[in-house]
């Protein structure tokens, strides 16, 4: 986990520089291996490292979640170099493991219990089914395969479970040695209950032990899957932190450009991850690219969510800024009004200041003016005194002439009345003069309007005559012509009526009106005929429109058919290209498989020939040994026959001697009795 933390805190270039290239091989040490297979594996590992370095250079400091996930999985699964364990260390490890196995040789699980076996088998079957064991291995699996297994079923299950723990491992030895060495390397706690002879025949009474071993591998795989899932979650959290950084508000155009560059880098990462995973799958001769495409779609959905969030944030920011802009505009308008008022007040202040200055300047002149006014008042007082003296003198003169003041006042009143009547007459004369002038102006305006009307009438009649002439109807222009006298505004023409003005020969009611009515009726008839023709043309126009509509519909249908045919052709072309590409890929894979099979067959043929030669030599040695042993057996048989014959002869002689002794003893006893 410390290694994972270091990987998360450093950039992809530092990680790739610090990674041991041997970690991308198997962590299980091999004593002997095929040189050709090792060279092939080293070539694949070199290619993988080159791809990883290329991805790291393109990604910069922010490595994508997919590549980090893959590198971390490889770091977890391939944490030990293949060549890191030497023979002495292997022997020490084996001795340590053997001591451990001897200490924990007893398996506490009730593997002989049928119910417990069913539980283990069901759990193993569920895990294999969930992880698509049958799809990956192309080997069917069922509960019957776990209850009554074959050697092939066990091999497929064991290889698949172990390769999930160590994807870089290559099975090269025989199954008995391979399984036993793998279990010893991964510290299977109950290895002492299994021996190599049992591995060569897993069925029968030994099967519960192997069910327990497979269940232990399933548990280890589940724990590893949980750890990797937790690691994926932590990496996704790191991606979420990048998303949070992208969702921060922007303040400058430079930040917007940086965010745009991050968006482009994210899209490049997504495609690079997809292409890299697909290429690795292609190198593994796998045709299923759907998981990588699904990951690409999910990544693009997250990317679209980021874009939508950014757009929503920019929209809200724009709305907020628009509200602020409106408030600023309103404040600016108020500020403008305030500035205008301030300008007006400043002008008023300047005007008042100027007035005050003028007043202050004039206030300096007031004492002189007051002095002049006082002098003027004194002068007027003196004049009044002189006038009063003159009045007194005139009064004394009138008394001497016997003229009273009442007569003077009466004469003044008469003079006033005469002046008033004169003023009244002059005012009435002015009124009459204004009325005459006004009437003359009105008459002139009426005369001008009449002349304008006559001009309009004349232009209208001329247009009517020309129009009727174009239609073939000749009208006498003099019959509808009106002419006014030239001296209409003279004083002799004042007070004439309309009939007197125009004359007895011409009247509005008789010939002109009749002619105009006749022309109007003719025009109405022509309008009616034109309307009927227009209605017919309208019907034809509607028919043409309907026909155009039907033609347009037919044209749209043909265009739709053309577009559908084009789309079908394009789909067929793309499908053909994809099929051709897939066929080429299959051909390349088959050629690669054929070449690999050819190489393997050559290797197998050479190994079989070598084994046949060794077997022939062994057969000859065995024949010689058989002949030698046959001679030895013949000698032994002859010796045994001789021994048996001698033993028989000796036995018979002993029996005869015993019989003779017995008879003698019997005779002796008989004689004594």
Curated annotation (Swiss-Prot):
Q: Which residues form a coiled coil?
A: 328-402, 436-464, 513-673
Citing just one GO molecular function, the answer is: microtubule binding
* Positions of region (Disordered): 1-39, 60-111
Protein localization: Nucleus; Chromosome, Centromere, Kinetochore
> Mind listing the GO biological process terms from this record?
cell division; mitotic sister chromatid biorientation
Mind telling me which Pfam families this protein's record contains? Answer: DUF5595, Ndc80_HEC
Compositional bias, Low complexity, is annotated for 64-80, 88-100
Q: Which N-terminal residues, if any, form the signal peptide? A: none
Keywords on record: Cell cycle, Cell division, Centromere, Chromosome, Coiled coil, Kinetochore, Mitosis, Nucleus
Assembly description: Component of the NDC80 complex, which consists of NDC80, NUF2, SPC24 and SPC25.
Q: Give the protein's biological function.
A: Acts as a component of the essential kinetochore-associated NDC80 complex, which is required for chromosome segregation and spindle checkpoint activity.
For this entry, the protein name equals Probable kinetochore protein NDC80
**What organism does the record attribute this protein to?**
Kluyveromyces lactis (strain ATCC 8585 / CBS 2359 / DSM 70799 / NBRC 1267 / NRRL Y-1140 / WM37) (Yeast)
């Amino acid at each position: 986990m410390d290694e994972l933390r270091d990987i998360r805190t450093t950039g992809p270039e530092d990680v790739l520089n610090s990674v041991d290239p041997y970690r991308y091989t198997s962590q299980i040490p091999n004593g002997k291996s095929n040189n050709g297979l090792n060279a092939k594996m080293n070539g694949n590992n070199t290619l993988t490292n080159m791809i990883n370095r290329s991805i790291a250079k393109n990604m910069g400091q922010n490595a994508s979640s997919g590549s980090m996930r893959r590198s971390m999985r490889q770091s977890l699964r391939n944490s030990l170099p293949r060549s890191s364990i030497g023979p002495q260390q292997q022997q020490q490890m084996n001795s340590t493991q053997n001591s451990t196995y001897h200490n924990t040789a007893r398996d506490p699980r009730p593997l002989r219990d049928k119910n417990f076996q069913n539980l283990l088998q069901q759990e193993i079957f569920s895990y294999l089914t969930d992880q698509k064991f049958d799809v990956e291995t192309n080997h069917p699996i069922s509960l019957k395969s776990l209850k009554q297994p074959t050697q092939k079923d066990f091999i497929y299950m064991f290889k698949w479970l172990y390769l999930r723990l160590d994807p870089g491992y290559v099975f090269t030895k025989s199954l008995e040695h391979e399984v036993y060495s793998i279990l010893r390397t991964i510290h299977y706690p109950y290895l002492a209950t299994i021996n190599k002879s049992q591995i060569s025949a897993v069925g029968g009474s030994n099967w519960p032990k192997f069910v327990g071993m497979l269940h232990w591998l399933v548990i280890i795989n589940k724990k590893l899957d949980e750890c990797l899932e937790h690691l994926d979650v932590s990496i996704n959290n790191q991606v979420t932190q990048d998303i949070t950084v992208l969702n921060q508000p922007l303040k400058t155009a430079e930040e917007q450009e940086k965010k745009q560059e991050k968006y482009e880098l994210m899209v490049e990462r997504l495609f690079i991850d997809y292409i890299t995973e697909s290429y690795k799958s292609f190198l593994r001769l796998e045709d299923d690219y759907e998981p990588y495409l699904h990951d690409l779609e999910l990544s693009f959905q997250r990317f679209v969510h980021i874009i939508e969030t950014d757009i929503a944030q920019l929209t809200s920011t724009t709305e907020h800024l628009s509200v602020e802009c409106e408030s600023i505009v309103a404040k600016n308008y108020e500020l403008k009004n305030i500035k205008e008022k301030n300008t007006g007040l400043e002008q008023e202040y300047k005007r008042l200041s100027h007035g005050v200055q003028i007043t202050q300047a004039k206030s300096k002149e007031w004492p002189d003016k007051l002095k002049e006014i006082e002098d003027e008042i004194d002068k007027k007082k003196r004049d009044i005194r002189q006038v009063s003296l003159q009045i007194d003198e005139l009064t004394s003169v009138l008394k001497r002439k016997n003229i009273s003041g009442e007569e003077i006042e009466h004469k003044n009143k008469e003079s006033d009345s005469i002046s008033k009547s004169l003023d009244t007459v002059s005012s009435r004369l002015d009124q009459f003069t204004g009325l005459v002038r006004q009437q003359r102006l009105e008459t002139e305006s009426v005369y001008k309007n009449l002349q304008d009307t006559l001009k309009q009438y004349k232009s209208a009649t001329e247009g009517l005559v020309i129009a009727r002439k174009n239609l073939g109807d000749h009208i006498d222009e003099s019959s509808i012509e009106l002419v006014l006298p030239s001296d209409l505004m003279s004083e002799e023409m004042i007070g004439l009526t309309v009939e007197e003005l125009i004359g007895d020969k011409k009247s509005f009611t008789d010939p002109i009106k009749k002619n105009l009515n006749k022309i109007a009726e003719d025009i109405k008839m022509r309008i009616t005929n034109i309307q009927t023709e227009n209605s017919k043309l309208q019907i034809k126009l509607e028919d043409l429109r309907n026909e155009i509509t039907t033609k347009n519909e037919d044209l749209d249908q043909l265009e739709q058919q053309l577009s559908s045919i084009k789309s079908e052709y394009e789909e067929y072309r793309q499908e053909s290209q994809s099929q051709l590409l897939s066929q080429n890929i299959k051909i390349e894979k088959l050629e690669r498989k054929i070449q690999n099979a050819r190489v393997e067959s050559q290797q197998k043929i050479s190994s079989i020939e070598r084994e046949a030669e060794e077997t022939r030599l062994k057969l000859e040695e065995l024949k010689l040994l058989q002949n030698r042993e046959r001679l030895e057996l013949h000698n032994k048989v002859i010796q045994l026959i001789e021994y048996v014959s001698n033993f028989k002869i000796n036995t018979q002689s002993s029996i005869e001697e015993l019989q003779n002794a017995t008879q003698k003893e019997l005779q002796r006893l008989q004689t004594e009795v």
